[in-house]
Amino acid sequence: MALRFPRFSQGLAQDPTTRRIWFGIATAHDFESHDDITEERLYQNIFASHFGQLAIIFLWTSGNLFHVAWQGNFEAWVQDPLHVRPIAHAIWDPHFGQPAVEAFTRGGAPGPVNIAYSGVYQWWYTIGLRTNEDLYTGALFLLFLSALSLIAGWLHLQPKWKPSVSWFKNAESRLNHHLSGLFGVSSLAWTGHLVHVAIPGSRGEYVRWNNFLDVLPHPQGLGPFFSGQWNLYAQNPDSSSHLFGTSQGSGTAILTLLGGFHPQTQSLWLTDIAHHHLAIAILFLIAGHMYRTNFGIGHSIKDLLEAHIPPGGRLGRGHKGLYDTINNSIHFQLGLALASLGVITSLVAQHMYSLPAYAFIAQDFTTQAALYTHHQYIAGFIMTGAFAHGAIFFIRDYNPEQNEDNVLARMLDHKEAIISHLSWASLFLGFHTLGLYVHNDVMLAFGTPEKQILIEPIFAQWIQSAHGKTSYGFDVLLSSTNGPAFNAGRSIWLPGWLNAVNENSNSLFLTIGPGDFLVHHAIALGLHTTTLILVKGALDARGSKLMPDKKDFGYSFPCDGPGRGGTCDISAWDAFYLAVFWMLNTIGWVTFYWHWKHITLWQGNVSQFNESSTYLMGWLRDYLWLNSSQLINGYNPFGMNSLSVWAWMFLFGHLVWATGFMFLISWRGYWQELIETLAWAHERTPLANLIRWRDKPVALSIVQARLVGLAHFSVGYIFTYAAFLIASTSGKFG
């Protein structure tokens, strides 16, 4: 018999129903469950697939550069970044009538185009790219790296080049390599690029391969470096009247600590950014020499962990046994990596708008909104993934004997206390926040807005004041004008910081009031509830009072029959599934808050947010309804306009989202019956009955239908909000 899909599971390949296809797709990447898998092959497969992943990333970024060079208006944008709209790529659509062609022909293009809201123009401009030729060169280089990655992936699947398991488990060497080699050397290389290409570019000096050996990045060259007079590199920075990309008002400094923003570009000083990357490079280069490898010097991570027993015995045997537990569990390592990456992605969202690093990006409001929302959603998915793999670790990899009384075992021992505390925090936040919002709603409905309960966020205001914000009048730390820190800050370190904090046109330490206080606690409710579901799912993954032998059922079982008092919806997968809804809900609140506050800031009517955000009707009416008018007007009696694509996407997003419920709120028997009826009709219909299928059609399993429903819900939810966000922002600010 010919090999049927899936080849990795002979059991599934012989399944006579359509379950074969769906289960095959679902388990294609679960290498551990494949036939004749060994630990060695498992590691080698994952390693090789990393190169494929890199190849895709390089190909994708190469495509961005290529399409902008070919169909964009980068060179025109460089001449006037604030008024030319950056083009992502052309649109060729045979359905376009004349009104559509006219609506989408913008940015000086000859035909219909898409506008770029990704910030790539600002990024490329900041790092020194100026011409289409530069973009093509970058695209070709990335294409080359993509091909190289594919070759490397193929190479490491050949018998001679397959690394051994011991190589994969050599944690110290890997850590040294990643810290020094990846983070250290790449940060140093980036500093080099900024100093040699980007900073001269910002001063009107065009540095390329033909002249980069002749153009000194600093008038004194490496003299100050070797003589130890490093402060010379910080002298004579760009002046506040510097015009970015020209020599007008420029200085000669390359590594500075100015703080604050370049007055014209509203972005961080490039010389500060170079200084930052140099510091990071030194830190990581040192960190990458700390662990013991072939040379017998440095720390052994196992020794560090074994020795780390907290005093007083309150954490039992501390970190004993953790080294082998982590080093032998891919799921534990993936969980740690995802948790770290998730936090970093969310931090990127927060910092890209509050401390913009790219020239003129702060004045491109739609891009700011798109980037913030994009990074927050990505962070949410990555963080939920961390807990999912944490749960799989407990089911597949956790060994109680190896971890007796260490911090991991004690987490499991104390899980009731952890879960109940999280539950209490979620209930407290939910009832109090909703109570305040609803009270305020009722007061407005009855025409007595003065009876609202409005709480000033005094602790948060105090923290902002401590960092230098003077408008609250707290007179503490950096906002205390006669304190030593304030006076040192004016001259020695970051003189621009205090100006930036108190400048109301940027997004650094936005002024906050009662509306912020309420939405902060609404978001805290969402975060705590999401965490509760995820933590409970992971800590109960091996077993609970109701189902002590849960680990024997694997990660994603739907139910264990009618006994035991009801064992449906309690698998670790079910917890992940529920948590994703809460994650989306929470990030919805986060992005609503960010977007509304910024729209009012950019429009200069901050009082609208302050007055309307203290009650739910304000959010529904003055944020969602008021800002959806652009979408509703995408198509109107006068024809269409450039927002119509977002109007269409808004409707399509709702359709996808609503389709999710068809899978989420429906029992399996209904679908099975429907499918059998359809199959029966098909087999008895002339012509149609000439086409037969090999697999008997069966309904999706409960878990699969939930996954399909969750995927539609998530994708539709994000599509809908993306269209709303981009249309409402670009409709106002262009």
From Swiss-Prot:
Native source species: Gossypium hirsutum
Assembly and binders: The PsaA/B heterodimer binds the P700 chlorophyll special pair and subsequent electron acceptors. PSI consists of a core antenna complex that captures photons, and an electron transfer chain that converts photonic excitation into a charge separation. The eukaryotic PSI reaction center is composed of at least 11 subunits.
GO-annotated cellular components: chloroplast thylakoid membrane; photosystem I
Catalytic activity: reduced [plastocyanin] + hnu + oxidized [2Fe-2S]-[ferredoxin] = oxidized [plastocyanin] + reduced [2Fe-2S]-[ferredoxin]
Disulfide partners: none
Pfam families xref list: PsaA_PsaB
UniProt protein name: Photosystem I P700 chlorophyll a apoprotein A2
Binding-site residues, chlorophyll a B3: 662, 670
Family to which the UniProt record says this protein belongs: Belongs to the PsaA/PsaB family.
Keywords carried by this UniProt record: 4Fe-4S, Chlorophyll, Chloroplast, Chromophore, Electron transport, Iron, Iron-sulfur, Magnesium, Membrane, Metal-binding, Oxidoreductase, Photosynthesis, Photosystem I, Plastid, Thylakoid, Transmembrane, Transmembrane helix, Transport
Documented EC number(s): 1.97.1.12
GO BP, sorted A to Z: photosynthesis
Membrane topology according to the record: Multi-pass membrane protein
Binding sites annotated in the UniProt record for [4Fe-4S] cluster: 559, 568
